C-alpha cells in the first residue's frame, strides 16, 4: 500500500504486451491528451513479441508521444510492487480478461485503475476507485481526462477505496468463506 499520496506523474500498464490488451488505445489516448500529459511518464511494463512491441513503438512515434511512452520490459517481484506503488494510475485497456489479476494488484497497492468492460471489474465504479469504461480510444481518453482533473486528495481516497474493495471482496479470508458457502449449497 502507498505510504503517502503525492502525484508522481506516472501512469502504468503492466501485463503481457499483446494486441488483446489494448495498449494501442492507451497510446492513442495519450496522443489525444498530449498537452495535458506533458511531464507524465506512461510506463508499459511487460513482455511480448518483439514485432508487436516495435509496432506499438512506431505508433507512439507516429503520434508524437514517444517521449511520454516508455517500454520497460517485464518486471517481477519487488520491482513490480514498486511500480504499482509509484503509479498515480494503472491502466488496463483490454479487449477481454477472465479476471485481470493486475487490476487487483494495483488496487491492493492503493492505485486507482482504468479498465474496460472487457473485465469483470464493474465494482471500480460502485467503490469509487477507478473507471470501468467501454473498450476503445475514446473511452480511454475520457477516463484519462477525468483522472487528470482529480486532486491528490481525491486520488488518495480512490486508492483507499480500492484497497477496501480488495479487502472486502478478494482477501484470502473472504474467498475461503465464499468457497465454504458454495460447498454448503452444492453438498447439502
Q: What positions do the PLM features span?
A:
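A conserved mid-protein helix/loop that constitutes part of the nucleotide-sugar donor-binding site
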Residues: 9-32, 42, 51-55
Amino acid at each position: 500500500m502507498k505510504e503517502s499520496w503525492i502525484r508522481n506523474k506516472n501512469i502504468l500498464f503492466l501485463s503481457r504486451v499483446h494486441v488483446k490488451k489494448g495498449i494501442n488505445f492507451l497510446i492513442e489516448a495519450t496522443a489525444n491528451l498530449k498537452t495535458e500529459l506533458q511531464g507524465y511518464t506512461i510506463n508499459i511494463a511487460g513482455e511480448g513479441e518483439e514485432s508487436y512491441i516495435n509496432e506499438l513503438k512506431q505508433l507512439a512515434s507516429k503520434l508524437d508521444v514517444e517521449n511520454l511512452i516508455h517500454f520497460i520490459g517485464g518486471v517481477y517481484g519487488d520491482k513490480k510492487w514498486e511500480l504499482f506503488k509509484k503509479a498515480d494510475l494503472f491502466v488496463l485497456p483490454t479487449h477481454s480478461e477472465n479476471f485481470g489479476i493486475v487490476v487487483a494488484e494495483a488496487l491492493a497497492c492503493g492505485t486507482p485503475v482504468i479498465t474496460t468492460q472487457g473485465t469483470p471489474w464493474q465494482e471500480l465504479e460502485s467503490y469509487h476507485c477507478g473507471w470501468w469504461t467501454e473498450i476503445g480510444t475514446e473511452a480511454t481518453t475520457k477516463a484519462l481526462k477525468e483522472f487528470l482533473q482529480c486532486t491528490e486528495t481525491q486520488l488518495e481516497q480512490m486508492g483507499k477505496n480500492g484497497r477496501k474493495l480488495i479487502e472486502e471482496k478478494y482477501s484470502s479470508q473472504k474467498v475461503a468463506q465464499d468457497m465454504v458457502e458454495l460447498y454448503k449449497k452444492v453438498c447439502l
